[in-house]
Amino acid sequence: MIGVFLDTETNGLNPQVHRILEIALKIVDLSSGEEKERFQTIVAQPIGAWEKSDQESLRINGFTWDEIEKGMTPRQVSQQIIDLFTLCGVRRKKAVFICQNPSFDRVFFSQLIDADTQELLSWPYHWLDLASMHWALTMEKAKKNQSPFPWETGFSKDSIASYYQLPGESKPHRAMNGVNHLLLCYEAAVGFPRKA
């Protein structure tokens, strides 16, 4: 089984108004932890979409118009991801997506590759989230009085990192920083059972 560890950066939280600005992913063997492939790019957007940016989102991720206008077109990004997933065998029952917040990442990912195309390519429809994994693991420990409840420590990615005594995510928030931090937290919480 392979995991597609994925993160996106956007110019706001509303997928009806805002657009994906950056995507990063790593394709990882979930038994060994071996990284098979990685992909990261800034996604160009038209000036009209940029002008609708939420300023708080841009403050967090630090993107500027100069960076965005030089990005790869959404069509180019889509084709590169399709080619990479085909090469790596990202298919239903053989892979899952893993994110910090898949309800957010999935809807913006679908701006690049729509749900019908994903279905046609037999891509996984399971998008797993780190927070739920952490929640389940810490609830089990809390039942045995070996851990505080997850709502006492928090379940943001930085809170999960702190729980495992890991550093917080590098700033500014960029997609590959998010993927690297997600993998670090995933390994601490869940692990790779056959990692050498």
Which residue ranges define each predicted feature?
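Short, flexible loop segments at boundaries between secondary-structure elements
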Residues: 123-142
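Acidic, Mg2+-coordinating catalytic module of metal-dependent nucleases/exonucleases
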Residues: 96-103, 107-112, 145-196
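Short, surface-exposed amphipathic charged segments that create phosphate/polyanion-binding patches used
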Residues: 55-58, 137-145
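Amphipathic alpha-helical interface surfaces
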Residues: 77-81, 105-108, 112, 126-130, ...
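Conserved non-catalytic scaffold segment of RNase H-like nuclease domains
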Residues: 1-103, 162-167, 173
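A short alpha->loop->secondary-structure connector
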Residues: 114-124
